[in-house]
Amino acid sequence: MKISPSLMCMDLLKFKEQIEFIDNHADYFHIDIMDGHFVPNLTLSPFFVSQVKKLASKPLDCHLMVTRPQDYIAQLARAGADFITLHPETINGQAFRLIDEIRRHGMKVGLILNPETPVEAMKYYIHKADKITVMTVDPGFAGQPFIPEMLDKVAELKAWREREGLEYEIEVDGSCNQATYEKLMAAGADVFIVGTSGLFNHAENIDEAWRIMTAQILAAKSEVQPHAKTA
């Protein structure tokens, strides 16, 4: 199981300490960039990405919750992003061009589905994705309740990947925590984006918070594995 902490949930007063710890323990950094239009919130920025890059060696995954993603690609490449993750709703009419532009800048491509957006919405370019993320909450704010219907979408993406012989990772964003780990693993998730309930609220000290999170994930995995063997 891969872990991608959401930096909009971190303690910014402990920026250096937490970035360095995450870099030593996680698989990705998840960086939410919102414009106040596509979602009603403003969060992180290309400048923030550039500051994380000074301390980090693990891949920086920039989730663009913006109306005009084309305005951010070159900026984020200069800032040091490794992935750019796009919503189908914002790239219709230019999906292939933007995906090609991301690759020309040497970055990988992520696609992300809002709860109401079907997998079918990206069927003509799903094969171009390195990673596909399922939003299991409505986008824009941390700490929202899990939407259980999204388990079917995770399973659908796993089945699609197997049927078409694709290699994208399946990632989950929203309320990844002790209550949902086992269900998400069983459905086929490969990567958890962890935020307030999954990591940062466990303890003030990130080392202790990480220990608690890891124990919870291992416990969930131990429950999933026996079922996988008998399937």
Model-derived regions: residue spans:
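Alpha-helix-loop-beta-strand connector modules within alpha/beta enzyme cores
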Residues: 42-62, 101-110, 150-170, 212-224
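Catalytic cores of alpha/beta
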Residues: 17-19, 70-78, 117-129, 175-192
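Glycine/Thr-rich beta-alpha phosphate-binding loop at enzyme active sites
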Residues: 35-43, 47, 115, 123-155, ...
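C-terminal helical cap(s) of enzyme catalytic domains, especially alpha/beta-barrels
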Residues: 102, 185, 199-231
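N-terminal active-site wall of soluble small-molecule enzyme domains
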Residues: 31-101
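Conserved, mostly hydrophobic/aromatic
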Residues: 15, 22, 32, 76, ...
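Glycine-rich phosphate-binding active-site loops on the catalytic face of alpha/beta enzymes
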Residues: 84-92, 133-145, 187-209
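Hydrophobic faces of well-ordered beta-strands that scaffold small-molecule active sites
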Residues: 3-7, 29-31, 52, 60-64, ...
